[in-house]
Amino acid sequence: IEWTDLVRGDQYFDPKLMSDPVIRRADGSWLYMLPSAIDDIDMGVTHVVRGEDHVTNTATQLQMFDALGAARPQFAHEALLTGSEGKLSKRLGALGMDAFRERGIEPMALIALLARLGTSEPVEPVTQAAPLIATIDFAHFGRAPARFDEEELAQINAKILHQTDYAAVAARLPEGMDEAAWGAIRPNISKLADVAGWW
């Protein structure tokens, strides 16, 4: 099984050395591998970006794409992220989207950080994903673990809010807050919930 990974380069797995994948539990419920491949086909996924701990899964899933007669998406396996104290923990969903949302992190702040994490390129506070996506080059991602810094994420979040247009946040602002008020308040906040202290 061969493919060219967008981060790791040419990959080769000998199927004779791989165990048969388990795709269904004894109770009839499906495990991740086959449903994920089917979803990718159904949704027209062209690129799969995930952690390097899934490289072996990719070899298995590529066989599934081939068996289903589907085009293979491109794969990029990035180095695993570390935190300020070493390995990141998934415990209690501390790094899940819901947790970031509850902390007032704007989706674009997370997208901006993740698009550059593991590269030498600076993280830019952007308010639209399309220009950022157009500049992603997987050849710039290193193989060494990248450090996820929540303080850096908070700073990017603030910078994004400082340049966010009124129209983009109007529905989320307190009733009666107009464009002039938003323009006066936005340089002073680090998350949208901070508006309440000014209005």
Please give the residue ranges for each predicted region.
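Active-site cores that bind ATP or allylic diphosphates and position pyrophosphate for catalysis
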Residues: 1-77, 82-88, 96
